[in-house]
Amino acid sequence: MAGHSQFANIKHRKGAQDAKRAQKFTKLIREIIVATKQGLPDPEFNSRLRSAIITAKKENLPKDRIDAAIKTASGNNQHDNFEEVVYEGYGPGNIALIIQTLTNNRNRTAAELRHALSKYNGKLGESGSVSFLFNHVGLIAYKASSINSFDTLFNTAIELQALDVEENDYDEEKMYYVTCNIQDFGNVRDQLFKKFSDAEFSRLFWKPINITTIDDEELQKRILNLMDVLENNDDVQHVDSNFIFNTKI
């Protein structure tokens, strides 16, 4: 299906993060803390918190740690004052990268990202240096096996003013990706949750307008190594990009 490669890297990177349990939990807890601080501590009245809790449960974060993170968010510990900062840059092969972080120290995070990108022949750019290559959208992802009818999902999503519903057969497990405008994200996500149950994951996503195909295997390896370094950084929540590999390595 046209456009499916725009989502090709999401599943791989999500799986790569799963390999490190403690680090994965750290990222989940940060998202819960930030979501709680931005609204009420009750997920029924805070859609971002609800989504964070759903994701945390799917990743087997213990309930007591979820509850503790929500409680922590109501405190005044300056070390838990995370802010959302988006960094833009280029990686090897001139691929475009948008790095979404939750950090309590902008200077530290920027320095670490700059070092990582430089090591792999990339560079950290200014705000706006690569974001024009992407559309910023809401993303709700379902396993195809959890949806009885693609047509029903498609029609429901479009009625909710979603932009598109796309099938991704790039991964071994087929996925359906619903995209919507940022301002509609909370409503589209919540209404889909009610009708089709909770999604596999949902988040704000930088969707590439065009895809750069990487053919060279050595370049592919350098890109994967950079992605590992970026996503092993505790401050990094997501890395969105505009590349796809011609062959899997």
Swiss-Prot record:
Question: What is the protein name stated in its UniProt record?
Answer: Probable transcriptional regulatory protein ERGA_CDS_03720
Q: Which GO terms describe its molecular function?
A: DNA binding
Query: HAMAP family this protein is in?
Result: Transcrip_reg_TACO1 (MF_00693)
Sections of the chain in a coiled coil: none
Per UniProt, the keywords (alphabetical) are:
Cytoplasm, DNA-binding, Transcription, Transcription regulation
The region called Disordered is annotated at 1-21
Its annotated compartments are: Cytoplasm
Any Gene Ontology CC annotation: cytoplasm
* NCBIfam families in UniProt: PRK00110.1, PRK12378.1, YebC/PmpR family DNA-binding transcriptional regulator
Highest taxon above the source species: Bacteria
Specify the species.
Answer: Ehrlichia ruminantium (strain Gardel)
Offer one example of a GO biological process linked to this entry. Answer: regulation of DNA-templated transcription
- Taxonomic lineage from the root: Bacteria, Pseudomonadati, Pseudomonadota, Alphaproteobacteria, Rickettsiales
**Sequence similarity:** Belongs to the TACO1 family.
